[in-house]
């Protein structure tokens, strides 16, 4: 419900802006580095395996100039993020290497302040909120632990984060489970955009989720984005 409210607020804000506001529409693309912040409890833990994983994003930007310096910044982007985690179920590492790959549609709403450094360069720091909707990016790989008495083996498997995963982990009646990831996410975003010669842009943003995208292990999105673009 909170995520849907953010979407409604973004759309409403875009509709009620003064007609005199100058609108700049652009396109941008780039790469991101992502991982998950962890706050699991009750035996459900998670750890990042390796460093932050690279992904990509493509999108459309819409900047509304309000007055001399203030700007309302929004748009819509398609972002794919990746991570590899060690996932624990009741303190047992049933999933020592779990690939997580997701596609997301990101809708931000930021307030920016345009600092005109020169006739050819502007810097725009910004802060705001975002809402996103996740959809599948195909099968992901994971390693699963099988235990029969003192014999422990690791076997490869496939899973889809939006569907979750479960399997029989050994005797007697043990099972390993990964809860499905949620589609809707929302959180905060801060950024800096450089506008060169009024048309070319270089942007850096950091997004952090407020909502747990996977409640079982307490995972929240954390993504650094770098983009270059063109404003019409």
PLM feature spans:
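Residues that define the transmembrane beta-barrel architecture of outer-membrane proteins
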Residues: 52-56, 101-107, 121, 184-188, ...
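Short loop/turn motifs that connect adjacent beta-strands in outer-membrane beta-barrel proteins
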Residues: 21-23, 68-69, 116-122, 138
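Repeated loop/turn-to-beta-strand initiation elements of outer-membrane beta-barrel proteins
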Residues: 23, 70-72, 121, 194, ...
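Transmembrane beta-strands of outer-membrane beta-barrel pores
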Residues: 31-35, 78-82, 106-108, 115, ...
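Outer-membrane beta-barrel "beta-signal"
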Residues: 24, 220-232
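Membrane-embedded beta-strand positions of outer-membrane beta-barrel proteins
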Residues: 27-29, 74-76, 109, 125-127, ...
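Extracellular/periplasm-exposed beta-strand and loop segments of Gram-negative cell-envelope proteins
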Residues: 36-53, 81-104, 134-183, 212, ...
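Outer-membrane beta-barrel strand-turn architecture
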Residues: 64-68, 115-119, 196-198, 232
């Amino acid at each position: 419900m909170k995520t849907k409210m953010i979407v409604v607020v973004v759309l409403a804000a875009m509709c009620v802006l003064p007609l005199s506001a100058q609108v700049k529409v652009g396109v941008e693309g780039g790469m991101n580095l992502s991982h998950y912040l962890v706050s699991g409890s009750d035996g459900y833990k998670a750890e990042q395996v390796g460093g932050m994983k690279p992904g990509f994003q493509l999108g459309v930007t819409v900047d509304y100039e309000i007055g001399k310096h203030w700007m309302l910044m929004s748009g819509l982007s398609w972002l794919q993020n990746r991570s590899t985690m060690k996932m624990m179920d009741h303190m047992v590492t049933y999933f020592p290497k779990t690939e997580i790959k997701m596609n997301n549609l990101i809708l931000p709403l930021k307030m920016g302040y345009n600092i005109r450094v020169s006739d050819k360069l502007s810097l725009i720091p910004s802060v705001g909120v975002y809402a996103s909707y996740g959809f599948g990016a195909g099968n992901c790989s994971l390693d699963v632990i099988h235990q029969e008495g003192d014999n422990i083996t690791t076997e490869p498997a496939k899973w889809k984060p939006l569907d979750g995963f479960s399997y029989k982990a050994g005797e007697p009646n043990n099972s390993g489970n990964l809860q499905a990831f949620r589609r809707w996410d929302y959180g905060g975003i801060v950024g800096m955009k450089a506008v060169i010669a009024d048309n070319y842009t270089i942007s850096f943003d950091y997004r952090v989720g407020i909502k747990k995208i996977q409640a079982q292990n307490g995972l929240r999105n954390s993504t650094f984005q770098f983009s270059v673009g063109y404003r019409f």
